[in-house]
A protein has these predicted regions:
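Beta-hairpin "wing" of winged helix-turn-helix
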Residues: 48-51
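Short amphipathic alpha-helical interface segments
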Residues: 1-25
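Exposed, interaction-prone assembly regions rather than primary DNA-binding/catalytic cores
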Residues: 78-121
Length: 121
């Protein structure tokens, strides 16, 4: 399975807004949700319970975002900034790392603090 950053974003923002554990999201196939939660757990962005059988994630429950997960969710909340990140980081090279994306988002946020407040959701 290939990592899909829109799916990652959707999971993080859903977990952040939820007051209860998440075991799936409408519009995301269960197998895709489970594997992306596993990636988020491995990256230290969520606290999750995973059921893994023969190296496949067969169930996942996300309890909460970690501190790092909260920070990343804050950075990707704005639809405008997220689209800009996709256009400038994710699409041009097709090859990137999570750390590159995080650093780009941090730079954009710090450079645009006065204007980002007006971007909305």
């Amino acid at each position: 399975m290939k990592r899909d950053m829109d799916t990652i974003r959707q999971i993080l923002l859903t977990v952040r807004e939820s007051e209860k554990a998440i075991c799936g999201i409408d519009g995301i196939a269960p197998a895709v949700f489970f594997e992306h939660v596993r990636l988020l757990d491995e990256a230290g962005l969520v606290t999750a319970a995973l059921q893994i059988v023969q190296n496949r994630t067969t169930a996942a429950i996300v309890w909460r975002l970690t501190w790092a997960g909260q920070d990343f969710a804050d950075a990707i909340t704005s639809d405008t900034l997220w689209q800009k990140a996709k256009d400038n980081v994710l699409k041009p090279t097709g090859s990137w790392t999570f750390d590159v994306l995080k650093e780009w988002l941090k730079t954009e946020i710090s450079q645009g603090l006065p204007t980002l407040r007006g971007l909305g959701q």
